A protein has these predicted regions:
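Intrinsically disordered, low-complexity, hydrophilic segments
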Residues: 1-67
Length: 67
């Protein structure tokens, strides 16, 4: 998956991210800046999931939006 593409299109993808993770605030999504590790951290923080689970969710999101 291409995180450079996601980062470059992050403003357009913020709605997708908020749709997938409704607990993320606008600030959370903005602060993630389309970077995988930042988004993983935000998902972990808001949902209280382990890092590997947050990574799995973020990778699934990336695969879906990179089509």
């Amino acid at each position: 998956m291409n995180w450079d593409t996601i980062k470059g299109n992050w403003k357009q993808l913020t709605g997708e991210a908020k749709s997938q993770w409704g607990k993320l605030t606008d600030d959370d999504v903005q602060q993630a800046e389309g970077e995988r590790e930042k988004l993983v951290g935000k998902v972990q923080e808001r949902y209280g999931v382990a890092k590997d689970e947050a990574e799995r969710q973020v990778d699934e999101f990336a695969a879906r939006v990179n089509k």
